[in-house]
Structure formats: structure tokens, C-alpha cells
């Protein structure tokens, strides 16, 4: 519904009707409000003339440092500190959708996608239709539209929530990235439950230090009117977070601390998944899931904690857990049986790679083989750390490309190589498709092959161009060739 400009922006005198909001001048249509803010890569104010030419009814722009400007056909509104107000402005325009939804924010270095996807499935099964916003896209489980960022821009977030609400969502599970928190993309949302999975090295190219990275994550747990905090007590930063005094209810979960609100004992892992006894102040029960790995058991506890925080009963929660499926590219299994078992996972940090390799070790009868790379234009410091993890936990290690972006792939490989004690034992192959094909071709039926880093991604980004590429497709084709060769 169009809204008068002076209702949307108190500083505006004009009541011109605004049809839509946009931060991108190329998307402006007649009647829109163009929001021009300085960004990390470019200043939106340089595109004001373009927005006006495309028919913008009004332009709100950052007043600080702005050059004098004039437009005949559009209302210009200078706003000091506009970037910090974008979420609130968009919230007003789209009818404050988060207030009408059960909004669950999930943050952490690893596990955000799995927890949000599992939580949405569980809520659907419990009769509360749940939307999803995150790395795999936005929408509903099984029908996601891919987006560019884990957490969309402030206007995109509010528009997405309004769209999900209109489509019938009563709840939304949202991945909340540290960038999103630091840049105020979710500033005016009303979260009911906040979930913390873990904190390990990532994004230091942006945050500069682990302290700044952790501080960005911590913002979500001091949110106004938050009802419940669900925190992983097996994580050192999680324990710090849990000790901070807030009005919201705390549900801590742990695989090792029997004093936690949610505690798993007697966990049994096999090729079919996990079975464990769940101990809570509300009683005990048996948790069953077909997901692999200890870290996925931790993810399931996060889901249970969020559902308890939303006042679902333990018995009804435990009934739906066996029906939950892991998201695409997260510990996704291909082959197995009389063929090599290939596991495709998004692990792209040292901690995530460690967890995946440790999770797969009990399933190995032959060799545990790890193929990985590191993304270009990202934290260089983690590259040798990932090499050390792979060398320590896998029997065989192959290194290849993983979204080199604008960097020279040879430089990325050199950074990784520095982390190996015995680099002469490692295969280095540029061309990820070729590496996957050769790796699977030489595998034995008893081997477990972990393809780490890209997971669900359907592209390889090289010098700014995203070329179609999928680990899942490449692995399936290579497994078919392996089967033909061993027939």
C-alpha cells in the first residue's frame, strides 16, 4: 500500500505517496523512494540523479557530507544518520511485519543454516507455518528463492518478512550474520527468540579481531523485548554470553555439562544417525535423528531449546525430530554401500572442517579423504589453519580451488600449503571439477570422501564472474563413472 512520505519520514514536509522503497537506483520505478546512503564499496548519493531520471517520487539521502543538490521532479529529504534508520523506515512502510510473527534469530559462526532449516521444518510439522531467511535463500522449506547475503539489507529484510507474513507464515527462522548485526540490517526487528550456536575464526577480514566479531554476535542477545536466549554452553564464548544479565529467559544446551537446561547423555552415533537421552528440568526423553555427527546433535539441541522457548512441550518436540532432514550441502551423503561414500559440506572454517572430519571418522572403514580450498578475498589467516586441521584428521588430503574471486589461485594455495607439516604428501590440483573427478576415480569402496567448502553453492566465482558449478553434480557424475569402471 502506498504511504505518504511525511508519515514515513518525519523530517519530510511533503505528503507525496510512496509506492516502494529501494536502495538501488537501477531498480527505481515511478513513485518510489530512493534511499541514498554511503556504503562500504560506493556512495549511493552519486546515483541520485539516475534515480530521479527513472521517476523517483522522493529521495532520502545522508545529510552528513552531502553536496548541495536540487531536483525539479522529486522531493529531496536530507536525513542525518540515515543508514542507522533504514530498518525502522522500512518497518513503518511494510507494516512492522516482525511484530506479527514469532521471529527466531539464529547466529553463530557455524550451524546457522542447519538450525534455521531444521527449526522451520519442526515448526511446520507442529502446525505453525514457518518462513526462512538465510544462506540458502528466503521462503518456505522446500521452496527457497536464493539471495545474495545471509542477512539481506535493511529494506530487503522488512520486505521479505512482510511477504512471508502475507504468504501465511506465523513464524520465521532467520539467520542473523555478524555483518547484518554490525551494519544494522535487523535493527528495528522484534525478535522473540535468539539462538547462539558457536564462535570460531571467520570474517576477521571484516571485523579485525575475534573480540569485535564476538561483540557483533552478542548484540542479538541484548535485544529489546527478547523473550528467550538459547545458548550453546559447550562453546567458550557461549558460556560468557550466558553469564550476561538480561531480562530474557535463558535456555542453555550442552553435550557435556549435566547442569545445562538441555543436556544429552548416552549419545549413540551410527550410519543411520543418532540416538540420545535428553535430560531437562521438564523431564527426560529419547532424541532420535537421521542426521550424522556430534555437531548435528548440538544443532538439534538448539532447535529443541528454541521450541521450548516458544512454549512447545517436550513430548511433541521429540516426536517431530526424526522427521527433520538436513539442508542441502550440509553433511549431504552421496554414494555409499558398494561405492565410496561422498559427503558434501559447506565447512569453510577451521572449526567447521574439524567437526565434519571428526563426525565422519567413526563411519570410515577404508581411508578418510578430505578435499578443500579457501575462498579468495577473505580472511587469509585461516588458510594455514585449515590445512593443519585437514592434515591432522584426514588420511589423505587434496587441495583445490574454492571461489578464488579476484585473487590468484596460486597465492591462495601457497597460503594453504604453509600450514602443512608434510606438503609433499598433499595433492594440489587447480580446477575443482577435475580434482573431484580424479579424487573419486581413485577411491576405494570403503573410503569416505569429504568435499568441503562449497556445500549447496551452484557456482565457482572467478575474477568477478560466477560460473555454473556444483560439488553435488560433479560428485554424482564421478560416482556414476566410478560405478561403470567397477561393474
UniProtKB/Swiss-Prot annotation:
Its EC number(s): 6.3.2.13
Cofactors required: Mg(2+)
A GO cellular component annotation in the UniProt record: cytoplasm
Protein's GO biological process: cell division; cell wall organization; peptidoglycan biosynthetic process; regulation of cell shape
Binding site for meso-2,6-diaminopimelate: 378, 402-405, 453, 457
Keywords tagged on the record: ATP-binding, Cell cycle, Cell division, Cell shape, Cell wall biogenesis/degradation, Cytoplasm, Ligase, Magnesium, Nucleotide-binding, Peptidoglycan synthesis
Entry similarity comment: Belongs to the MurCDEF family. MurE subfamily.
Name the record gives this protein: UDP-N-acetylmuramoyl-L-alanyl-D-glutamate--2,6-diaminopimelate ligase
Organism: Ectopseudomonas mendocina (strain ymp)
Gene: murE
